[in-house]
Amino acid sequence: MRALAEFIMRGRVQATLVVAGCAALPLLYWLGAAAGCLVLLRRGLKDALGVLALGLLPALIWWLQFDDPRVLLVLLGSSSLALVLRASESWVRTLLVSVALGLVYSVMLGAAFRPQIEALAQEIVKILPLALGDLYQQLSVDERARFASLIAPVLTGLIAALLQIVSVLSLILGRYWQAMLYNPSGFGREFRSIRIPAGPAMLLLAGMVVGPNFGPQMALLAPICSVPLVFAGLALIHGLAAQKRLAKFWLVGLYVTLLLFMQLIYPLLVVLAIVDGLIDFRGRLASKDADNANGEG
């Protein structure tokens, strides 16, 4: 990874080759987005504009020729987040801005893939009686209709949230490269300090829980609003592991468990981030450790 980061920062030609080359490959576009973030974070928009403009050409081809806007959305989205992070130096603000980015993604995806999403939603509606069993039979006709109307917006929100996550991960990789080259160990301290305050955390929770009550289309807010909280939850785990000096094995176990049991660990991270916004686990633990060191605990 270090060799690739050094190659990207060697000059505009090298950076453009990586961004454009990765954007042309459907499974590596996230790597091109990370390269664009690295250039933007280090050199600013003026120097990065030419690199990004040429790198976006393959993404435009994917959209115009294959009706797939995802590569373009991630490249533009991660670059936008990089601009926010460079200007604010705040991961919390950047993660909150990613919610707006997710909403933009949902609009674009809804326009580009509406027939496919609606067809998939209809197939899911057909299997609901089998999936829910007796619970589905207990629902009234109106409740079944309302439940069915939420499926397409939720699917759109899930796809948008996935692209939102990829955009944030690309930014994280770009920031990690920047720290590796110019500020070793700086990224770890920066990431472990991420904590969404109580106010924004409650707003995100409201978007997830209350949003669907304002209409079926608002159901897409649930997955999109959860993304900043998940990253804050991961930062909390990293921060606590660092404070307790736990072996990296525990963090590896966390990510393996997250991949294997996503449906369980993902909401748990959301809950942890919300509670941390109210309690501040790391701050309390640091204060307790300081008291113990002073002989007061």
Q: What are the roles of these predicted feature ranges?
A:
Residues 59-64, 71-113:
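Short helix-perturbing small/polar motifs within transmembrane alpha-helices
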Residues 156-182:
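Transmembrane alpha-helical segments in integral membrane proteins
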Residues 223-297:
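Long, positively charged, glycine-interspersed low-complexity recognition regions
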Residues 16-17, 49-53, 72, 95-96, ...:
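Hydrophobic alpha-helical transmembrane segments
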Residues 1-54, 248:
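Hydrophobic transmembrane alpha-helices
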Residues 181-235:
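Small-residue-rich helix-loop
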Residues 31-39, 71-79, 219-230, 266-277:
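Hydrophobic core segments of alpha-helical transmembrane domains in multi-pass membrane proteins
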Residues 108-155:
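Membrane-interface interhelical loops and short interface/amphipathic helices
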